[in-house]
Amino acid sequence: MPNLKAIRDRIKSIKNTKKITEAMRLVAAAKVRRAQEQVIGTRPFADRLAQVLYGLAERLQFESLDLPLLQKREAKTVGLLVISGNRGLCGSYNTNVIKRAEMRARELTQQGINCQYVLIGRKAIQYFQRREVPILNTYDNPEKIPTADNASVVADEILAGFMAGSIDRVELIFTRFISLISSKPVIQTLLPLDPQGLEVKDDEIFRLTSKGGEFEVSRETVSAAVKSFPRDMIFEQDPIQILDALLPLFLTNQLLRAWQESSASELASRMTAMSNASDNASELAGTLTLAYNKARQAAITQEILEVVGGANAL
């Protein structure tokens, strides 16, 4: 016969665990909302910067631009900037981005290209340090949503390596946010930049809302079309000098948006994982409660039979 006390203790433990996972789910949901607000707050600057760069690129499209950040050279060494999380309990978020980085490194190695890593997030740092790969620098994720200051520190580091010639190309590997239950590791070339190839497309803002007591994501399409500078606009400085000054800002902005999107993906993955854990805990607690009731009923029935048997013996 099952041990009633053991079943009761296990049910209590599972219910306590469910309280923890539910609290973690709500915390992750609140942080996703803050991440959303942060992205929306930085959008005006990003849109204006894209407009200025787009206008300058259009103005200078027939000129030869001899700017360091635009110079493409033979790739002998590629820097892989990998963004992961600091903690676990977020499903396959960290595993997927690390696997994508390893896959890309193998592809480059097969082409005879050396790889050096710049790592963001403790999970990627711990993983690649154990494998003793060449690491240029490591950064912890901030406790809150990444800011422009955080992105600027990393951007300055990779920019210095690119300008010094120790890195010929920088590729960013991060997780693109698709929905609360879906994200995808992607690769984006950060350096060298190409203003002639600046694409300005419609963007989407992901808003975390609630409906029927459940969290869901609504999508809002934002027009990102830009207007060209007037043809008669006069620059006090040489447009090439202006472009040279704005390109580092554009690099930092690109990194910031990817970092914020990775952070939102991690939080959404954690929220989903904790939601699934809470559901599983409820289901397991229900199954154990049923088993407990059956065992208790069997024990009572056995006691009644023993009493009746004893009475008949008298």
From Swiss-Prot:
- Keyword presence, Ion transport: yes
Q: Which family does it belong to?
A: Belongs to the ATPase gamma chain family.
Q: How does it assemble?
A: F-type ATPases have 2 components, CF(1) - the catalytic core - and CF(0) - the membrane proton channel. CF(1) has five subunits: alpha(3), beta(3), gamma(1), delta(1), epsilon(1). CF(0) has three main subunits: a, b and c.
Summarizing the function annotation, the protein's role is: Produces ATP from ADP in the presence of a proton gradient across the membrane. The gamma chain is believed to be important in regulating ATPase activity and the flow of protons through the CF(0) complex.
**Identification of the protein by name:** ATP synthase gamma chain
Q: How would you describe this protein's topology in the membrane? A: Peripheral membrane protein
- Organism equals Trichodesmium erythraeum (strain IMS101)
Per UniProt, subcellular location reads as: Cellular thylakoid membrane
Query: What InterPro entries would the database entry show?
Result: ATP_synth_F1_ATPase_gsu, ATP_synth_F1_gsu, ATP_synth_F1_gsu_CS
List the keywords (alphabetical).
Answer: ATP synthesis, CF(1), Hydrogen ion transport, Ion transport, Membrane, Thylakoid, Transport
GO terms (molecular function) for this protein are: ATP binding; proton-transporting ATP synthase activity, rotational mechanism
GO cellular component labels:
plasma membrane-derived thylakoid membrane; proton-transporting ATP synthase complex
* SUPFAM superfamilies attached to this UniProt entry: ATP synthase (F1-ATPase), gamma subunit
State if Repressor is listed as a keyword. Answer: no
